[in-house]
Amino acid sequence: MLVVKRKKGESILIGDNIEINIVDIDNGSVKISIQAPREVTILRKELYKEIEEENKKAIKVDMSLLKKLNKK
C-alpha cells in the first residue's frame, strides 16, 4: 500500500494512463477526478460492495425448485 499526501490541484499517476486529481478539500472531504480509459471500471467501494452482495443474493437458488424443474 502506498500512502501519499496531496494538496488541492495536485495529482497522482497510476501507470501511464490513469490520473487522479485532487479537485477540492473541504471539512474533511476530498473531491477527486479520475481520468482513465473507458475500459477501466471505476466504482466507489461501498457501491462495489453493494453490487457484490446483490450478486450473491441473485445466485442463491432454491434447490427444491431446481428439482421440480428437472422432473418436467
Swiss-Prot record:
The gene is csrA. It comes from Clostridium novyi (strain NT). GO terms for cellular component: cytosol. Belongs to the CsrA/RsmA family. Signal peptide: none annotated. Keywords: Bacterial flagellum biogenesis, Cytoplasm, Repressor, RNA-binding, Translation regulation. Homodimer; the beta-strands of each monomer intercalate to form a hydrophobic core, while the alpha-helices form wings that extend away from the core. InterPro entries: CsrA, CsrA_sf. Its main location: cytoplasm. GO terms for biological process: bacterial-type flagellum organization; mRNA catabolic process; negative regulation of translational initiation; regulation of bacterial-type flagellum assembly; regulation of carbohydrate metabolic process. One of its GO terms (molecular function) is mRNA 5'-UTR binding. This is Translational regulator CsrA. It is found in: Cytoplasm.
